[in-house]
Regions:
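Short, small-residue-biased leader/transition segments that mark boundaries at the very start
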Residues: 2-7
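Short linear capping/connector segments at secondary-structure termini
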Residues: 200-202, 239, 338
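Active-site groove signature of glycoside hydrolases
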Residues: 182-208
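Secondary-structure boundary elements
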Residues: 10-11, 138-139, 176-192, 218-233, ...
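Alpha/beta catalytic barrel-like cores
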Residues: 14-163, 170, 179-181, 191-193, ...
Length: 430
């Protein structure tokens, strides 16, 4: 047994030596283009990514224990999903152990500690989240927050835009309370809590009074956002459509873009909430001329807002590339938003986070000064040539080194670690 351990340690040392050698070669290659790889790694380590708690349990939460409804749906029934707060926290801690960098945790209101009590959404207070605040502090994580308009008997097809004053006031009160909870979180962690407002409101079929519902939504938002809270930042999220709400969405992109621009509110860009042929990255520089900040919900749509696991694909790379090219990192907050119940959920987290990190790192390693110079001088051939050549630069060696220096599994090593966790922990959740 001791001999086997020595062999494993020897192999590990050899692999580390190879990673270091590859990094030195990559460092030299990038330096020739005026890019500092050490600085890129340092920036990546400091750039926060907000993990979404709902991947761990398929958006069920701890309020009612029911599957998500209201235009969203998690598909798949892979065993091992978190069934309570302790299991969810255990899974997030496992995810953190396999990642390098800076992370936040994004909570929906339905993930509060309700203690088995029936606390309705217009009654929720910070008391249901003090445990989360303390746990996050112990994990060296900051919290973000979301109001939850779906999966409730009063959800229906309209919440904040509902003409029925009783239902509408219920959701207005809920959202006001969520903002106060977010403010308490921000004060506790000495860092603003980003509070996202997304409502599913819409219609399955042809709608006659579109303007009426949008006016009601505007008035509801005006009332909700009137309360000044210094330790949180509100952001508003649009959507194309939802399941059962295909014909009309009250909070469309045009509605929220106009509202956020007029009222100086942060805008949420969800990469799954656009037409499949749209390039979401194009919206970054356009919106930032008119809104103060952006919240990014990075997902992977498959024909619609299917919330597949984020990958290192063109859409993700283009999004982060545009953030860096537009010098917008200090005005953008990065979060993930997908929920795949068909695969190991810990693995889903790691794949998505690593995809976001790789996309960020590749953007940090771009020879921007040279590219900008070519563009300013009208050297379009040179610009296109360098854009093409940078695709095969050895950024993978830089990402491997980033993980190695933080004592995190390199490459595919995390697969075995997750398989072990599944066998020892997840498989026993029956």
């Amino acid at each position: 047994r001791q001999r086997q351990m020595c062999i494993r340690d020897s192999i590990k040392t050899m692999k580390a030596d190879l990673i270091l050698k590859n990094y030195e070669i990559a460092k030299e290659r990038y330096a020739a283009l005026g890019v500092d790889t050490d600085k890129a790694i340092e920036t990546l380590e400091k750039t926060p990514i907000s993990l979404h708690c709902w991947q761990a349990d398929d958006v069920v939460g701890f309020e009612r224990g029911e599957a998500a409804s209201g235009g969203i749906q998690s598909t798949g029934n892979y065993p091992g999903k978190a069934r309570n707060i302790d299991e969810l926290r255990q899974d997030i801690e496992k995810v953190n152990s396999l990642l390098a960098g800076t992370f936040r945790l994004n909570l929906h209101e339905i993930y509060g500690e309700f203690g088995g009590k029936q606390i309705d959404r217009n009654e929720v207070t910070v008391d249901q989240f003090t445990g989360w605040m303390q746990w996050a502090k112990e994990q060296n994580m900051k919290l973000d927050f979301n109001s939850t308009s779906f999966s409730h008997p009063k959800s229906g097809s309209l919440s904040l835009s509902n003409p029925d004053p009783a239902i509408r006031e219920f959701w207005i009160e809920h959202t006001k309370r969520c903002r106060r909870i977010a403010d308490a979180m921000g004060k506790f962690q000495n860092d603003p809590c980003i509070m996202n407002i997304w409502v599913h409101d819409g219609s399955k079929d042809i709608t006659v009074e579109k303007g009426r519902y949008r006016e009601i939504l505007k008035n509801s938002l005006d009332e909700i956002l009137a309360e000044e809270l210094p330790n949180m930042k509100s952001c508003l999220e649009a959507k194309l459509f939802g399941i059962g709400l295909e014909a009309y969405t009250v909070g469309s992109h045009d509605f929220y873009a106009g509202y956020c621009a007029k009222n100086n509110v942060m805008y949420t860009l969800d990469t799954g909430h656009y037409e499949p042929t749209e390039n979401v990255s194009d919206a970054v520089s356009a919106l930032l001329l008119f809104v103060p900040e952006l919240m990014l919900h990075v997902s992977r749509p498959m024909h619609w807002d299917s919330d597949h696991v984020t990958l290192f694909d063109d859409n993700t790379r283009n999004l982060f590339s545009e953030l860096v090219r537009a010098n917008a990192l200090d005005r953008a907050h990065i979060g993930l938003d997908y929920f795949d119940g068909s695969i190991n959920r810990i693995g889903a987290y790691i794949i998505g986070v690593r995809a976001a990190q790789k996309s960020l790192l590749q953007a940090f390693l771009e020879p921007l000064d040279t590219l900008r110079k070519y563009e300013d001088e009208g050297k379009l051939f040179q610009r296109l040539a360098l854009l093409e050549e940078e695709k095969t630069l050895p950024f993978g060696a830089v990402y491997d080194y980033f993980n190695l220096k933080n004592n995190i599994p390199v490459g595919e090593e995390y697969i075995a670690d997750i398989e072990k966790y599944e066998a020892e922990v997840l498989a026993k959740r029956v």
